[in-house]
Amino acid sequence: MEEPKDKALDEVFDSALALHHEITEGTEDTASKALQDKVEEANTINIINIPITFILTIIVHKVKKAILMLEDATRLVSLLDIFSRNEHHKELPGEHLKYFLLPVLLGDLTTRLVESDRSEVVENAQVYYVDFLQRCTDYSIVELASVPTVTYVKEEGEEEKENVISGKPDLAKMNAERSGKMARFKETKQLKEDLRLLQESLAKGRDEEVVRQFHIKLIKKFVNSSLDEMASLKMEVEMLQHMAKMRAGKVMVEVNPKPARKLKPIVITADKMQKEVYGLGYPR
């Protein structure tokens, strides 16, 4: 019999995953009565901004709601000791594999926060993606040459040292990155087709092996998107630093220390000691 906490975790995660899909795939219920009435009202008084604002408000609300749900699910995963870094993914029940997605879903939703400081958003999103990629590597779901690291937005004076270093672009590295991106694109295309077929099989009945295959392929699809997102976020860090330098007029000035962060990534605690020191969910 399923334990109450297991059932609660399952329900919270599935609801959050459905909400994430709704947000990212644009499956907003535009046919809903409330939204239709709002659009008709706007068209009647010729104010086109009303439906746009209304839709954006709904999306922002859903993003924040999904983040809170996923953070709760992360705490429950830690509480239930579902993961240990000494395990292999084959040792886990098929139904537990989906919880690998917690940090990557949080990372994706974090990038969609529009009311927070962008530097905080970019840094915290990277923490989530790295946590996801590292766990997938630890459990041998994928083999990566190296797991990307978090690139932080540097203080005004910290970037000068790097700016002095200049030279020709690393063409070999650029070609390797381009080839990697193309390979991931092709693999993702195949994974989407495989997932579609597996989903059809699951609709006919819950077979343990099919469930396992579905979640493994879904995780691999998110691994590919995470690697692409990490590359994009690193570029955004460079852009944020460049913009900060432009605003400062390229003059070194003393800046006030950063205020305490409002965003704190909640990741899965792996062992008892971490829980005692940091709590059930803690920022890395």
Question: Which residues fall in each region the model found?
Answer:
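Conserved small-residue packing positions in alpha-helical repeats and bundles
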Residues: A16, L102-L109, S179, K186, ...
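Elongated alpha-helical scaffolds
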Residues: E91-L113, V127
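TPR/TPR-like (Sel1-like) alpha-helical repeat modules
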Residues: E123-D138
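Short amphipathic alpha-helices and their capping/turn residues within compact interaction modules
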Residues: H21, E25-E28, R75-I82, L109-S116, ...
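Surface-exposed beta-strand-to-loop junctions
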Residues: S15-I23, L105-D108, P169-D170
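Extended low-complexity, polyampholyte segments enriched in Ser/Thr/Pro and acidic residues
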Residues: E22, D29-E41, I58, S140-R284
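Extracellular glycan-interaction surfaces
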Residues: R118-E120
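Internal amphipathic alpha-helical repeat/solenoid segments
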Residues: E2-N46, I52-H96
